[in-house]
From Swiss-Prot:
Catalytic activity, as annotated: an acyl phosphate + sn-glycerol 3-phosphate = a 1-acyl-sn-glycero-3-phosphate + phosphate
Record-stated family: Belongs to the PlsY family.
Domain of life: Bacteria
GO biological process: phospholipid biosynthetic process
Name listed for the protein in its UniProt record: Glycerol-3-phosphate acyltransferase 1
Biological role: Catalyzes the transfer of an acyl group from acyl-phosphate (acyl-PO(4)) to glycerol-3-phosphate (G3P) to form lysophosphatidic acid (LPA). This enzyme utilizes acyl-phosphate as fatty acyl donor, but not acyl-CoA or acyl-ACP.
Keywords: Cell membrane, Lipid biosynthesis, Lipid metabolism, Membrane, Phospholipid biosynthesis, Phospholipid metabolism, Transferase, Transmembrane, Transmembrane helix
Broad enzyme group: transferase
Main location: membrane
Amino acid sequence: MLSWTVILTGIFMAYAVGSLAGGHFLSKILYNADVRQVGSGNAGTMNVLRNLGIAAGIMTFIWDTAKGFLVVTLGLKGGGAELGVLMALAAVAGHNWPLYWRFQGGKGLATSLGVALAVYPAAVPPGAALMGLLTFLTRNTDLATLLTFSALPIYFWWREGPGCYLAFGLGLAAIMLLRHGPLVISLFYNLKERR
């Protein structure tokens, strides 16, 4: 049984590491710019790709995926699946809402990929396939993301694994609902206004 000190330290560390947005650092280092001041205003891979180029986008994707994978792997080795799951959710939350930059972060896709590869890699191929299909059908990555992550709890329930994996799916779905839900609602509202 892990102590509360270990659990809270792990969560804080994961949030802090998750908050280190690759897009922010790379835009400063390579271009002396703040990616949050251009395009969509977030520090994630897609905004970097669209506004700073393919190379910067790829480096941002690798950075954000790696930070999620590494911090959760550390948690899994040090405290087992339960601590790993808590740290995974904290890392994604840190990426989406970093304290360092007034909670203006990315959308969490690359970091979610990293934590999923650490916690339950078998979920990644079907998740990526579903995400690709939904993006093709809806032509909207926010809606596709929301639908894909909403399916995660169902996947883990179907797999009948330990309860912490179901909690992982529910937690990621909730985080993505908070991050992408308002964007999807805004999209539908704008479409309705145009009619």
